[in-house]
Amino acid sequence: MIGRLRGVLVEKQAPEILLEVAGLGYEVQMPLTSFYELPDLNQEAQIYTHFVVREDAQLLYGFITKQERALFRLLIKTNGVGPKLGLTILSGMTAGEFVACVERDDIATLVKLPGVGKKTAERLLVEMRDKLKSLLETSAGSEREFMLKSNYTPAPVVNTAEEDAIAALLSLGYKPAQASKAVSAAFKEGMSSEDLIKSSLKSML
């Protein structure tokens, strides 16, 4: 298993990099939280990796810290969360922000991430709670500090109609920011989910 790579960063195009190590080029996919911590092109970089072997491909996922990799490995053990969604989650929030979401049972923030529906968010909260507790208990002081570091702000409380409308727009491929903006602009007190979805869609056409 490939657990760590150190080499020259020869290509950077989010979320993928090409790292040259001893004459070999390794294609590595990274969460944006790690990607933006990388040095400039042609500089030396060290990353911690997770190696996935599938029938049709061999994939490397890279992280700046061992702690972020450890969290990724816990995420992909959650039912319904594969490497792609795990990468998306860690691109949308830091490790510390994710830990804070789980500690506060914050479904509203999790469902704003692309690909994370209400059921997946609920599974994450249930399945990750004990796993994170165990990870934090076994982490050294600096590692624990990293995992808890965040600029976490709970998502504002919204009513069911707004949640349903945002979820519907996300399922159609709109970005979280676009969906939230359109729903907020279209919302009127007493609107049903169906009417709010229709009004939000009209404003985006």
Curated annotation (Swiss-Prot):
**What are the GO MF terms of this UniProt record?**
ATP binding; four-way junction DNA binding; four-way junction helicase activity
Region of interest called Domain II, as start-end residue ranges on this chain:
65-143
| This protein's name | Holliday junction branch migration complex subunit RuvA
- The annotated region (Domain III) lies at 157-205
One GO cellular component this record assigns the protein to is: cytoplasm
Which keywords appear in this protein's UniProt record, sorted alphabetically? Cytoplasm, DNA damage, DNA recombination, DNA repair, DNA-binding
User: Where does this polypeptide localize?
Assistant: Cytoplasm
Task: Report residue spans for region: Domain I.
Answer: 1-64
Q: Subunit structure, per the record?
A: Homotetramer. Forms an RuvA(8)-RuvB(12)-Holliday junction (HJ) complex. HJ DNA is sandwiched between 2 RuvA tetramers; dsDNA enters through RuvA and exits via RuvB. An RuvB hexamer assembles on each DNA strand where it exits the tetramer. Each RuvB hexamer is contacted by two RuvA subunits (via domain III) on 2 adjacent RuvB subunits; this complex drives branch migration. In the full resolvosome a probable DNA-RuvA(4)-RuvB(12)-RuvC(2) complex forms which resolves the HJ.
Which InterPro entries does this chain map to?
A: DNA_helicase_Holl-junc_RuvA_I, Hlx-hairpin-Hlx_DNA-bd_motif, NA-bd_OB-fold, RuvA, RuvA_2-like, RuvA_C, RuvA_C_sf
Residues in the signal sequence = none
Q: Which organism is it from?
A: Shewanella woodyi (strain ATCC 51908 / MS32)
Q: What is known of its domains?
A: Has three domains with a flexible linker between the domains II and III and assumes an 'L' shape. Domain III is highly mobile and contacts RuvB.
- Give the GO biological process terms: DNA recombination; DNA repair
Q: Which family does it belong to?
A: Belongs to the RuvA family.
According to its UniProt entry, the function of this protein is described as: The RuvA-RuvB-RuvC complex processes Holliday junction (HJ) DNA during genetic recombination and DNA repair, while the RuvA-RuvB complex plays an important role in the rescue of blocked DNA replication forks via replication fork reversal (RFR). RuvA specifically binds to HJ cruciform DNA, conferring on it an open structure. The RuvB hexamer acts as an ATP-dependent pump, pulling dsDNA into and through the RuvAB complex. HJ branch migration allows RuvC to scan DNA until it finds its consensus sequence, where it cleaves and resolves the cruciform DNA.
Region feature (Flexible linker): 144-156
Please tell me whether the keyword Cell wall biogenesis/degradation is annotated for this protein.
no
Please give the Gene3D superfamilies that the UniProt record associates with this protein: 5' to 3' exonuclease, C-terminal subdomain, DNA helicase RuvA subunit, C-terminal domain, Nucleic acid-binding proteins
